[in-house]
Amino acid sequence: MFLKVLMLKQDDPRKCSAAKLVKFGLAKPVTRTASRTLILNPFSKKILLKSDKKLVNSITGIDCSWNLVTSAFQKTFSGISRKLPPLLAGNPMNYSKLNKLSTVEALAAAVYIMGDSALTHILLKKFKWGHTFFELNKNLLEDYSKAKSESEILEICHEYGLEAI
């Protein structure tokens, strides 16, 4: 799966996980989104499913500050918008906070759910805390990757005692 990042440059560039992915050639920086890309949008009404893979040729992470996330996503982006199911952050800024993922965590989760666990590990290896994100979420990610519908995702959330999304 081809990865892209739309960097809104709202964070400290030294701590920006999207910039690091670009630096290592793991994601391409873009200035606008394409129609056949999957947009990771925490405000989307639809949850990401493995079956979404056949609809797109890339995944785009919108890199923005969590403090400005509402205004960042008021803009409309071309592409297919999906939100991730609930996951715990493994990054030092938001450790164990539900759904407060860094861009790399969001992209890694999306590619795992869509069936590319090898790419997930490649992405996370670039960060000291990458393994922490995976350890916190490995069972969830595995279950989410097997879900065939949003109702199955909601069942999984209920089984793990996670708040409804």
Model-based region annotation:
Residues 14-102, 113-140:
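Active-site cofactor/cluster-binding pocket
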Residues 9, 32-33, 162:
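Acidic, serine/threonine-rich low-complexity regulatory regions at protein termini
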Residues 138-165:
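Long, charged alpha-helical interface segments
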Residues 1-11, 37-40:
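Short hydrophobic beta-strand segments
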